[in-house]
Design a protein with these regions (language model features):
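C-terminal transmembrane helical hairpin of 12-TM major facilitator-type secondary transporters
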Residues: 308-364
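Helix-loop-helix hairpin linking two adjacent transmembrane segments in secondary transporters
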Residues: 129-183
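Helix-to-loop junctions at the C-terminal end of transmembrane segments
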Residues: 55-67, 294-307, 403-404
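A late C-terminal transmembrane helix in Major Facilitator Superfamily
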Residues: 371-408
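Helix-breaking motifs and short loop linkers at transmembrane-helix boundaries and internal kinks
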Residues: 35, 67, 88-93, 274, ...
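Extracytoplasmic gate region of multi-pass secondary transporters
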Residues: 23-24, 241-285, 289
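Cytoplasmic helix-loop-helix junction between adjacent transmembrane helices
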Residues: 98-132
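Conserved MFS/SLC helix-loop-helix module at the cytosolic interface between two early adjacent transmembrane helices
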Residues: 54-93
Length: 449
């Protein structure tokens, strides 16, 4: 039973990634068939992202009311219907219409699953589950390419992904009883917290509520059945939790730097390093390979390393990757092992940046119960998901403006600035949560895997 539910969660993370890169891979053909400019893909992406942000912000109240199992099942159903809608779209405006349920479903399932896994499973599973997302994001474009190469329309690619999503939806509805068994009577998931963390959470929640007035204000008691205990926290209440603002900001800057690297590293290679455009497009894939493989490794290392150590280690490797971009610009024409030296630096840089990014996202999510208590986890993770999409949407275009006016040579410097901002916010998060936990006298959750 436990193993089957975990298998369902792994499949759910693969399904999260499946449609994410479909639009980008199919759009060169889609925009011609739909008779719209190439730039219109940005409108579809923006609408999906805005709906995702909206549903992420509402995820806590929905999760408390319906539970993780139902939210996941209905959200995947919603995304499956939206993908079927994409496959039937014969105009750009139909795409915009179906982008709304796609974004709403994606945001809800992302926040719900991350909340559930953070409470119920070890850091190993959190990293491997996000590795599954990377596999799904890689499989999606491959399926679309397979369909297109055999002479079928892009709509058949979406149809095939929709069928896969429908199969997962069926399994999710079959598994609703398993999710329900693991939900606490108060609507807060308890279940399989690793290494006795459940007991620590209950004891610590009570102690915090009895020690300081500030803690009493911020806590939602796990052992009460009152309506107040079940009520979703307001955004203002969340921000009053020590370290919450820094946690949300850390997520914002992390997702901004990941999206900036993925979006602009190719342009930096082409326009600043004079690398062939086709080769540059292939090299960008190394960054995502580094993220996927890095999360697999992080799952192994999490048996010995705490989430904090994984995050700080990842940030260090990320900075190493960024630093390798600087000598790449100074090594034009030089050779090493039959390759241009600048290409060697770029390959190493992209791999290190991917490996560095790998543990940060899942480890921040997984450490949320430890830093803020299980009763606040759903609220924090919903806001983390929203800040992730806002960071991905807002700061990469800022570099586009800078590149237009000052050149793509600014790319490594911009990445350094975002990295420093992320590191500063994360260090502030550690400082404030550790100060708060000293007031509470003992840790909230054992962070051992």
């Amino acid at each position: 039973m436990f193993s089957f539910l975990l298998l369902i969660i792994y499949l759910s993370f693969i399904s999260l990634g499946l449609p994410d890169a479909l639009l980008g891979s199919a759009w060169p053909i889609m925009h011609e068939e739909l008779k719209v400019p190439l730039s219109y893909s940005g409108s579809v992406y923006m609408l999906i992202s805005c709906c995702t942000i909206l549903s992420s912000l509402k995820s806590e109240s929905l999760n408390r009311r319906f539970g993780t199992g139902k939210i996941t099942a209905f959200s995947v159903l919603l995304t499956a219907l939206a993908i079927f809608g994409f496959s039937m779209s014969r105009s750009f405006y139909m795409l915009l219409l179906f982008a709304i349920p796609y974004g709403l479903g994606a945001g809800s399932v992302d926040a719900a699953l991350n909340h559930y896994v953070a409470l119920h499973y070890s850091s190993r599973h959190m990293n491997w589950l996000h590795c599954m997302w990377g596999i799904g994001a890689s499989i999606g474009p491959y399926i679309m390419g397979f369909v297109l190469q055999r002479g079928f329309s892009w709509s058949k690619g979406y149809l095939l992904i929709g069928i896969l999503q429908s199969g997962l939806t069926f399994l999710l509805f079959l598994s609703l009883g398993l999710w329900k068994e693991k939900e606490d009577a108060n609507g807060l998931a308890k279940g399989e917290l690793h290494d006795g963390a459940e007991a620590h959470l209950e004891v610590e929640t009570k102690e915090r509520a009895e020690t300081t007035p500030e803690a009493k204000t911020n806590s939602l008691m796990m052992d009460t059945e009152s309506e107040e205990g079940k009520k979703a926290m307001s955004f203002r209440e969340i921000l009053r939790i020590p370290g919450a603002k820094e946690c949300i900001a850390s997520f914002f800057f992390y997702c901004a730097i990941e999206q900036t690297i993925g979006l602009w590293s190719g342009s930096f290679m082409v326009y600043s390093l004079r690398i062939d455009a086709k080769l540059a497009a292939s090299l960008v894939a190394l960054f995502y390979f580094g993220i996927t493989f890095g999360r697999f490794l992080a799952g192994i290392f999490s048996a010995k390393w705490k989430d904090e150590e994984l995050i700080l280690g990842g940030i260090s490797i990320l900075f190493l990757g960024i630093v390798l971009l600087f000598p790449a610009g100074l090594s034009s024409g030089k050779q090493l092992f039959g390759m241009e030296l600048r290409q060697v630096f770029v390959i190493l840089s992209l791999l290190f940046m991917g490996l560095g990014c790998a543990p940060i996202y899942p480890a921040i999510i997984h450490s949320t119960p430890y830093n803020f208590g299980a009763e606040n986890t759903s609220a924090l993770i919903g806001k983390q998901m929203a800040s992730a999409y806002i960071g991905s949407l807002s700061l990469p275009p800022v570099f586009g403006v800078l590149a237009k006016n000052f050149g793509t040579e600014l790319f490594p410097f911009y990445a350094v600035v975002l990295g420093i901002a992320m590191l500063y916010m994360y260090k502030q998060l550690l400082k404030k949560t550790k100060e708060a936990k000293r007031k509470w006298k003992k840790p909230i959750v054992s962070d051992e895997a």
